[in-house]
Amino acid sequence: MKIAVLLSGGVDSSVALYRIINKGYSNIKCYYLKIWVEDELSYIGNCPWQEDLNYVEAICNKFNVPYEIINFQKEYYNKVVSYTIEELKNGNTPSPDIFCNQRIKFGAFFEKINSQYDLVVTGHYAKIQIKESKFLLKQAKDKIKDQSYFLSHLSQKQMSKLYFPLGTLLKSEVRQIAKNINLPNKDRKDSQGICFLGKIKYNEFIKYHLGEKKGNIIEKETGKIIGIHNGYWFFTVGQRRGIKLSNGPWFVIEKDLEKNIIYISHNENYLKQAKRKFLVHEIHWINDTPTNFENFKIKIRHGEKKYSCKLKLITNNLMEISLNKKDQGISPGQFAIFYKNTECLGGAKIFKIIE
């Protein structure tokens, strides 16, 4: 069996490589995917991918496995970065990591290697199971690290070639394995933030592409101007950090795109803005469309929290979702991801808040 391993230089993908080798497989090649943004914004700091590459080389040398660097800068820009920029311009809250997995790691990469490999291994925290000739996406053992939210737009064809060795492990167990076998990156911190940015700060990325435009920050209840911001695209509904005003905490509760105004409110008033009903479109099911939606739960952001909900299919590409509890941070552009027990069934894009 020929196996390709996506190696990032981090602990997770390195332990995934070790576990597949430990199963007795030897016909293995590792790939490091080099992406667009890191070079384009390298003026901000040190070359962010060089450190990754140093670890990739050290890991492959340790296990005597060949590796190759594949340049996907153009594909990243066209399929992920441009989407993110457009969503920000439209005042939405994008979820680029979902498309990073669907369109690049398991899209462009699969197209590149074509049928050369029988299996592609990554360090994602999730599980794939087969039931009645269908591939099911299941949550990982570690519910905190679980990445099924970001994998929710995979296809059956993509899942048929994927294996996630870390799906049955806790993060603490992965760290312990790395120490036990003395991996060169055993003490390396986990990467944070959006997949394509590397060490680049998100606001630097936004500033580079959309610039800055001064606008008013207005207290919703009083209509008073209490501050100035550098552009609505730097803010998302529900945001608390980064407002940098006294007498807080403050929360972003509304954005006026035409006038470039950010409306904020104190905590007690912010909680009153919570919503529970919204519309989604661009619906993707990992398997066939369910015949009923009983006992479904959804996530509206990455993390452990799921909501019980009622789903009403209006058309094949339009659905109304009613949560059992209100949420303060529902925002157009986010994705609602569907679950039944531990199975991730797919997801859809939020485009209108109702109540």
Curated annotation (Swiss-Prot):
The keyword tRNA-binding applies. It is an enzyme of class 2 (transferase). It is found in: Cytoplasm. One of its GO terms (cellular component) is cytoplasm. GO terms for molecular function: ATP binding; tRNA binding; tRNA-uridine 2-sulfurtransferase activity. It catalyses: S-sulfanyl-L-cysteinyl-[protein] + uridine(34) in tRNA + AH2 + ATP = 2-thiouridine(34) in tRNA + L-cysteinyl-[protein] + A + AMP + diphosphate + H(+). GO terms for biological process: tRNA modification. Catalyzes the 2-thiolation of uridine at the wobble position (U34) of tRNA, leading to the formation of s(2)U34. PANTHER family: PTHR43052, TRNA-5-TAURINOMETHYLURIDINE 2-SULFURTRANSFERASE. This is tRNA-specific 2-thiouridylase MnmA. The gene is mnmA.
